[in-house]
Curated annotation (Swiss-Prot):
Protein name: Killer cell lectin-like receptor subfamily B member 1
Residue ranges that the UniProt entry lists as topological domain Extracellular: 64-214
Cytoplasmic compartment segments: 1-42
Transmembrane segments: 43-63
Main subcellular location: membrane
Localization per Swiss-Prot or TrEMBL: Membrane
SMART domains: CLECT
Length: 214
């Protein structure tokens, strides 16, 4: 009677031994784990890059939105005549609407004085920048054109200051002029900065005039 019991115990021990020896086969699946981890990591990185791109676009839009709304308000105010009636505001042909202004960009490059004369002949003046928000919009405008332009700002050697064509002195809190402050220096606007150059240099220019009621 003792023999069968012994056999059963040995059989059970062998079965347990087999189960124990089969356990080392499990790490084969585990060895595949790092591959899946790498794939997941790559997908995660790609998703993060995409989210950052979307975020940058949204930030750019949110920055520009107040500026665009400000222009819309300015235009809407000018659309209302003294009588309270709505009026149509239009720019002349070949001029670009910008807030409450019309802008003209020259097709040729000439010295600053020639640009000033050209604007005067068109019943306009070289561009005047009123505030920092308008500066950013005009830099985007310049970026779209892919050029740099003379504006209505010139260095006055006698007074040692930069002056706009309307006689007002440049507010350095509004913008900083990159380059030299010296006689015969005129300001240009590009997509990134406002800088000085010799007034005798050939450059494009921007004229401005107010929107007209028609």
């Amino acid at each position: 009677m003792d023999a069968p019991v012994l056999y059963a115990e040995l059989n059970l021990a062998e079965t347990r031994g087999l189960r124990c020896t089969s356990a080392p086969s499990l790490p084969q699946d585990a060895c595949q784990g790092p591959g899946w981890h790498r794939v997941a990591l790559k997908l995660g990185c790609a998703g993060l890059i995409f989210l950052l791109m979307v975020l940058s676009v949204l930030v750019g839009f949110l920055v520009q939105k107040p500026l665009i709304e400000k222009c819309s308000v300015a235009v809407q105010e000018n659309r209302t005549e003294p009588t309270g009636r709505s009026a149509t505001l239009e720019c002349p042909r070949d001029w670009h609407p910008h807030c409450d202004k019309c802008l003209f960009t020259s097709q040729t490059s000439r010295p600053w004085a020639d640009g000033l004369v050209d604007c005067n002949l068109k019943g306009a003046t070289l561009l005047l920048i009123q505030d920092e928000e308008e500066l950013r919009l005009l830099q985007n405008f310049s970026k779209g054109k892919g050029q740099q332009f003379y504006i209505g700002l010139k260095y006055e050697e006698v007074d040692k200051v930069w002056k706009w064509m309307n006689g007002s002195i440049l507010n350095t809190n509004l913008l900083q002029i990159t380059g030299k402050d010296e006689e015969n220096s005129c300001a240009l606007i590009s997509q990134t900065e406002v800088f000085s150059d010799s007034c005798s240099s050939d450059n494009h220019w921007i004229c401005q005039k107010t929107l007209k009621h028609v």
